[in-house]
Amino acid sequence: MMSIRALSRGFAPPILQDRGLVAGLESLAARSPIPVEFVRDLSPELVLAPEVERSAYFVAAELLTNAAKHSGADAIRLELSDRSDGAPGRELVLRVEDNGTGGASLEDGHGLSGLADRLSGLLGELAVESPAGGPTRVTARVPLGR
């Protein structure tokens, strides 16, 4: 049993498996070299599938890393919510916004296109708003319970 648990932890950080997505994102935010404001608006009854949690964690980690390396920002906002926005069905929405210089792109060959590919496996999508001069806002959406 322990070896199976150890193997499964190789695919997800222990905090994610032991304490869930919110704790995992809190940990990422605390370790960021740029101050991160973490805002969440989640339904109390929300239970996410493990693959959704892993993808959301991975996307957040990559976006925070990209902001720290490339944005020139001095503040980041990380948002996590589950909502419908008037659309049919519920979705998990993860948004990272920084006050940096902008210029991020979803073009092939850029790191963000790989995140979009990862989300597409869950029928999710990634949207990037990053005008020259900033700010950059990246929004990941994954449908829940469809």
Task: Briefly describe each language-model feature range.
Residues 1-146:
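Coiled-coil dimerization/phosphotransfer module
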